[in-house]
Amino acid sequence: MTTNETNGFYKLSWAQRIGFGSGDLAQNLIFQTVACYLMIYLTTVLKINPAFVSGLILAVRLIDCFWSPIVGRYIDNRNPKLGKYRSYLLYGGIPLTIAACLLMLPQAATWSTNLKIVYATVSYTVLSMIYSVVNIPYGSIMASMTRDNDEVLILTSTRMVCANIGQIVVQAGFPIGLAMCVHTAIDWNQATFMAIGTIPAFVILPALPMLKKWLGKKGLYYTLLSIGLVGFAILFVIGKFFDVSSYNTLVQIAKVMTGVGLLVGSLMWALVPEVITEAEYRTGNRPAATVNALAGVAFKAGFSIAGWITPLVMGWIGFNFATEESALATDPMAWFTVTCIFAIVGFFLLMLCFMGSKENITTTPEKPVSFGEMWQEFKASKCLQLVLGIFVVVFLASFISGPVNAYYTKLANYSAIAQNAILVFTTIIPAILLIVVGGLIYKYPLTDERLDEINKEIEARSKA
């Protein structure tokens, strides 16, 4: 073992990087199903009132705001034999797969309205809580593998490529899978539009180290955000003044550009290890699970606000998901089948992550971390506050248009009022939120040079 590795600056193999990244691919097969299609399922297949669905999504996420810190605190204060963090991929992976399969039972479509509401509430709440048990320790694994900034960047890039593979598989594969199950023609324009925004990840993420050296950390973020804003502007102009179907190529190009802007959300995970290192520098402890739990709360806050606002406000504007023509097949068995396939494949990928990840840097506090100390950490760390704020806004921008994207390519099928509602959520609101993200990134204080200084000081303390 080299001196650098003794001090935590481990160099990782591609087997370790891909093994770790497979965990994000696995989780995205489930998370993207919920983010993009659960609302459509509840309103168009089960015919539950969109206002209730809106409240349900918000309520579950509020529960998670309390649940995630509990999970993070529990994990930080324990050290299981199979690994401080990786063991939960196994312990939580099995119930997560079962809960995902039970989320869209075909029998539920025949139940009474009250029973549907109880079923939707229980199944979604249980899935969300189990997901946190897997997601929080998974996010902590990265900070335990190495302190090396270059390795963290490569690991983040690998993780995000895998995550985006999961995203593109679900966003394009779900409508394709539904069409195949009910033996109808596949709407390739719709499937492409749903997923093509993920394509930039496969080009930009592998080139991230080079782009970061060329543009700088903040310069890279600003460039991506600017491209995204142009893409949203093009989509708005085409949707408002032209026939979308006549400009399909330009529409798909613009969607790719919006994906470039929203890719900033994926890159935010690279800042989490920085915040953890800064916390270790100040306190002497490395609260990886606690910080990841708070990041998870912020991430889910953006997701939940999007899920709450979208059906509610679109209904006020004039678009009711339950009564408008559905953009997807509504056969309950088709939804159940596709969801189960993604969940089962996800389980095997979680096991690959469990076997491929190696924890090199972990600390367990001498005394348990209290919730008061977690709050003090939040108040003491400006870096953490800014990163959490960015998480909320950028993922709100990402998810607020998720379910509505399925309707954009079919704008001509809807009334003028409904078209305006679709455009507001697929173009205007995400663009405004990206501008806010740019402002928050401007305030982020940790430069790469400062991080190197912090790591050297931590190393010097460990030798003393």
Locate each region found by the language model.
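Membrane-embedded alpha-helical bundles of multi-pass transporters/translocases
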Residues: 2-464
